[in-house]
Amino acid sequence: MSQNIGKISQVIGAVIDVEFEPGKLPPIYNALRVTNPSIDDKENNLVLEVAQHLGENSVRTIAMDSTDGLVRGQAAIDTGKQISVPVGRKTLGRILNVIGDPVDEMGPVGAEKEYGIHREAPAFVDQSTKVEAFTTGIKVVDLLAPYARGGKIGLFGGAGVGKTVLIMELINNIAMQHGGFSVFAGVGERTREGNDLWMEMKESGVLEKTALVYGQMNEPPGARARVALSALSIAEYFRDEEGQNVLLFIDNIFRFTQAGSEVSALLGRIPSAVGYQPTLATEMGELQERITSTNKGSITSVQAIYVPADDLTDPAPATAFAHLDATTVLSRQIAELGIYPAVDPLDSTSRILDPQVIGEEHYAIARQVQYVLQKYKDLQDIIAILGMDELSEEDKLVVARARKIQRFLSQPFHVAEAFTGAPGKYVELKDTIKGFQEIVAGKHDDVPEQAFYLVGTIEEAIEKAKTLAV
């Protein structure tokens, strides 16, 4: 079969127009290949994805790599299929880019099968409706906003409040305890963090169970807008063909939206609210609906979601909210108190915080903890104006317990050992419930609040109190 070859007619940043002969337009999402000598000396090293048809013989495409050095009239070859990435066990322990090429200098992937990155979401009849929680070993999450197996979890937070550290701790805890496969999509984040994650995974022995797919901050918007889909295709293979329970980590889903908005104006779309692309909800829906549990296996996804200027009503985080089963909101106010993980116990929510799923005891204690913290929040204005002495004895007790709960919600992380000097702690759910139940019941009213800071179980807090008393 003769190749369908077009010619570049216009280059505007990451968007390239290609002309074909009449009747030979490639379909939307098809991959075209062009030789760009400024990337490297290989043939057909630049992939373009067809995004629009312009009239009868021209397409508008998005480039997956640098377009510097391209010229008008250059040949673009239609591959006849969409961007495909290698899938299967050979991808484990490897770092791939958006088009599935390895970037870890460890030779070709050698996978037997490839999946296209644009795939249909599973049909309703194939989706599983079973609801069960899975334990992360992080107290604040397991108690107040538990994660559902096969669910979608969002980590919301502004810049520098600890989203990436929390994701790395989850990868560490879940890979150690859960033993299944993980896929990590680095979408538009810092290359340094991607490198750190790879090194840490190597050291902890988790790497051989994880596939890493990176499209980092320094890459063109085309790569950042598609890399999450590439990672998702790898996860779908493990779910559908091997019946695995896969974990998909995306850091950061906001960059997926941001990359879409960068190319949207160049594609000639009129921007909508706050300058985002008009197709924001559709693009997010196409990605999120593929992340689900089926009768064969499940994909549980944990997504870091950057919140621009700490504004949760911004269209990008607000659109992501609609798809989530649990939200873990990281708060700058809590980070300022030195409490890490800086999870807001009152803003974080979970669909499965329900006595029928997690049991009556867990539910009751979670609600009591939230009640005490909410009461403390309500009293803070009075304390700020009049001081603690003006409170009733009952309110003073509530404040003392709330401050202990607040500190007990902190926890030393394995991945932060280098910074804190404290060994990381994985806390079993039963120990978490027991600890908070004892604080709320007033068993530890005589223990100083510092004893609860950065410990694992309640027993450790009591031991720490003994050393403080000396």
Swiss-Prot record:
| Keyword set includes Ion transport | yes
Pfam families listed in its UniProt record: ATP-synt_ab, ATP-synt_ab_N, ATP-synt_VA_C
Cellular compartments per GO CC: plasma membrane; proton-transporting ATP synthase complex
Q: Which UniProt keywords apply?
A: ATP synthesis, ATP-binding, Cell inner membrane, Cell membrane, CF(1), Hydrogen ion transport, Ion transport, Membrane, Nucleotide-binding, Translocase, Transport
Q: Name where it's found.
A: Cell inner membrane
Which residues of the sequence carry a binding annotation for ATP? 157-164
Which PANTHER family does UniProt cross-reference here? ATP SYNTHASE, ATP SYNTHASE SUBUNIT BETA, MITOCHONDRIAL
The record's similarity note reads: Belongs to the ATPase alpha/beta chains family.
Q: What is this protein called?
A: ATP synthase subunit beta
What organism is recorded for this protein?
Geotalea uraniireducens (strain Rf4)
